[in-house]
Design a protein with these regions (language model features):
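Conserved small-residue
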Residues: 1-245, 250
Length: 252
C-alpha cells in the first residue's frame, strides 16, 4: 500500500489497522482550496518543517480551525520536492517515539503543494508569482538555517551569486534572499498587499537577519534603477511588510 492522496481516502481501514492516524479533514478539498487561494508559503521543506510546523498546521486543520494548508518550497535541495514530496502527494509519515518506548505513527497531510524555488524553471517561477500576487496570502516563513540568510563571504565581500543577482535585477534572482525580494516586488506591483515574513530558524534576532538580507538586495536594486523608492518604502512599512522575531527555544 502506497502513501498517497488516493490511499488515505479509499483505504482508511487498512491504514487504521496498521495503527496509522490519518488526517481528520477532507484532504482533497484542503488541497484544492489552498492552491486556489493560498495563505501560507514555507521555504525550507526539510524534516523540521515536516515534523513540527506542518504537524501543527495539521492539528488546526483536524480541529476545523483552518481550512487551508501550507505550500512548501525549497530553495536549495530540489530533490526534497522531486523525491520526497511529489511522489507521495506531499504527504509525510511522522513517527513519534513515546516516553514508554512505543511509537505512534501519523500521516501529515497539511502540505497542499511542493515547489522548487528554481529561478531557471519558468513554470515554477510563474507559479510563485501567481501565489505572491494573491492578496489573500498572509505569511511566508523560513527554516533554511542561519546560513540561508547570509549574503557575504568571510572577507566581507558579497557572495558571487548575490552580486550577480544585484547586477542582473529581480528578473534573474537565484539566491534565496534575492528571490524573496523579487517575489515581494511582484506583490508590490500587484497592489502592495500586506504580508508577514517570518523566520522560524533557531538564531538570535532571526527576523532582523531576514529583514537585513532582503533589504540589502532591494536597496541595491533601487540604486541600480531596477526598483523605485516606493518599493523600498513598502518593505519598510511595518503595516505592510512585517519581519517579526520568533523564539524557537530558550538557547538563543
Amino acid at each position: 500500500m502506497k502513501m498517497n492522496a488516493a490511499s488515505i481516502k479509499n483505504q482508511k481501514a487498512e491504514w487504521e489497522a496498521l495503527g496509522v492516524k490519518l488526517p481528520a479533514f477532507d484532504h482533497d478539498a484542503m488541497t484544492a482550496k489552498t492552491k486556489e487561494h493560498p495563505v501560507w508559503v514555507h521555504f525550507g521543506a526539510g524534516n523540521i518543517f515536516r515534523g513540527f510546523i506542518a504537524a501543527l498546521q495539521q492539528r488546526l486543520l483536524n480541529e476545523g480551525l483552518q481550512d487551508r494548508g501550507i505550500i512548501a518550497a525549497d530553495t536549495f535541495d530540489y530533490d526534497i520536492i522531486d523525491k520526497i514530496y511529489t511522489p507521495f502527494d506531499n504527504l509525510t509519515m511522522m513517527v513519534t517515539l513515546n516516553p514508554d518506548g512505543s511509537t505512534s505513527r501519523e500521516i501529515i497531510g497539511s502540505v497542499a503543494e511542493g515547489l522548487r524555488a528554481d529561478s531557471s524553471d519558468a513554470a515554477m517561477m510563474a507559479r510563485f508569482k501567481e501565489i505572491f500576487t494573491d492578496p489573500g496570502l498572509q505569511m511566508i516563513s523560513f527554516t533554511i538555517t542561519e546560513k540561508g540568510y547570509a549574503l557575504y563571504r568571510p572577507d566581507g565581500s558579497l557572495m558571487p551569486v548575490v552580486q550577480a543577482d544585484i547586477d542582473e535585477g529581480p528578473a534573474h534572482a537565484r539566491h534565496a534572499m534575492s528571490m524573496v525580494a523579487a517575489l515581494l516586488f511582484e506583490r508590490f506591483q500587484a497592489g502592495a498587499a500586506p504580508l508577514a515574513v517570518v523566520s522560524m530558524d533557531n538564531c538570535s534576532h532571526n527576523g532582523e537577519k531576514l529583514q537585513s538580507s532582503v533589504m540589502t538586495v532591494a536597496k541595491a536594486w533601487a540604486e541600480k534603477g531596477y526598483v523605485g523608492q516606493d518599493f523600498i518604502a513598502y518593505l519598510e512599512d511595518e503595516s505592510k511588510i512585517a519581519f517579526p522575531w520568533s523564539m524557537i527555544d530558550k538557547i538563543t
